[in-house]
């Protein structure tokens, strides 16, 4: 059974790239066509790369590895935290602190300090101190919780990282590459595919797209954990969400992708470029 369907990708707007004036030429091979000045990503390739990334994550976790989820842009913060928490993996959805990977020994000391402050607060360790001291300790704890709370249980650098928007998270990607940690990421049309080991061509700006693809990676982690525990294979297919009706041109794209006979690229391109200008518009082109 497919990990995710073409219909789910279309419903979440995964096929919308950036404006044609904002692109990375290295992404040309992942682009199907353009419509109304917006690049349309080839979802057939997206499905293929999702399968590769899914298998890699599943095997990595099954053999004892961990995956760090990274997404600090507003569109990704909620899904990154929710999905990582669901499968017990570390995450960063606030500002990435330089050295989180390359200087992990120092970061680990800060994590120990966070746990120390939490223990003091819970066991009455703040008692007997002045109000000013208590306020200072509380602020320190809250600051550490905000910046490091998602990785509180990360005892060592991860086996791989999942990234939403490699341009925004370029520091995290750079640190992972420096340490030889595999990078799995959504590749929008303005990204550099050379920086990613397991790319998934798609829209990294739409909330639903980022959530769907993050859920796919989390499902791969869950299946890997079950395999590690000897519980057998789980169905990693994400649950379908209520979706808005597809525009006519998107319905044609879905039909051409699911037809028993492979349609010609010319016919598919015509179906897209001839679509009415008032069809479903892409998400805001913001990083």
From Swiss-Prot:
One Pfam family matching this protein: Ribosomal_S2
SUPFAM superfamilies: Ribosomal protein S2
Positions of disulphide bridges: none
Low complexity biased stretches: 254-277
Coiled coil is among the record's keywords: no
GO terms of biological process kind: translation
GO terms assigned for molecular function: structural constituent of ribosome
Top-rank lineage group of the source organism: Bacteria
Spans annotated as Disordered: 254-287
Keyword annotations from UniProtKB, A to Z: Ribonucleoprotein, Ribosomal protein
Cellular component terms per the entry's GO annotation: cytosolic small ribosomal subunit; peptidoglycan-based cell wall; plasma membrane
PROSITE patterns, A to Z: RIBOSOMAL_S2_1
Family to which the UniProt record says this protein belongs: Belongs to the universal ribosomal protein uS2 family.
Protein name per Swiss-Prot or TrEMBL: Small ribosomal subunit protein uS2
Organism: Mycobacterium tuberculosis (strain ATCC 25618 / H37Rv)
Taxon lineage: Bacteria, Bacillati, Actinomycetota, Actinomycetes, Mycobacteriales
